[in-house]
A protein has these predicted regions:
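Short, functionally important secondary-structure microenvironments
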Residues: 1-166
Length: 166
């Protein structure tokens, strides 16, 4: 959260923006964004995390002979469970982007339904965030997908133009 907020012309509007941002950050903790444990068994999908992590580590060892056998233990103890999870994806950045967007959308939905006192300001900040969004049709396919997901979580997908090539 920034030390100084000068996003809007009035002190009151800037304070509302601050409350929305602070509420969203607190929602990460309150609604469990960081409760994920890599080694906890999946109860919905086939659990392939450990297999994928081992496969990735073996690929790294084949490509780099200088990797020591104890590196896996050091890595596991020095990174968070979330980092460990995203490291198993071939396109880590895309996986992290999709997770962040969907998780932020989940949090926004919870905040809007459980904190009615901030709802008007929250929706206003969401609406304002649409002003500087890029045009989807001007983006490459992967970026267009990400932008579409952002708009969906801001509940603005209905008026979003999707190029036919995507």
């Amino acid at each position: 959260i920034p030390a100084i907020i000068n996003r809007y012309p009035t002190k009151e509007e800037n304070f509302y923006w601050f409350k929305v941002i602070a509420t969203h950050q607190v929602a990460h903790i309150e609604f469990g964004s960081f409760r994920f444990k890599f080694d906890t068994q999946s109860n919905i999908f086939n659990d392939t995390r450990s297999m994928l992590e081992a496969k990735q580590f073996n690929t790294i060892r084949i490509e780099d002979d200088s990797v020591e056998p104890n590196t896996a233990a050091i890595t596991e103890s020095s990174i968070t469970d979330m980092q460990r999870f995203f490291n198993i994806f071939e396109d880590r950045t895309l996986a992290l982007d999709i997770f962040s967007i969907v998780e932020d959308g989940r949090l926004d939905t919870r905040v809007l339904s459980e904190y009615l006192g901030i709802k008007r300001a929250y929706i206003s900040v969401q609406n304002d965030s649409m002003v500087d969004r890029p045009e989807i049709k001007s983006l490459p396919a992967k970026e267009a997908l990400i932008e579409f997901l952002v708009r969906m979580t801001l509940q603005r997908s209905g008026d979003t133009i999707i190029p036919s090539q995507y």
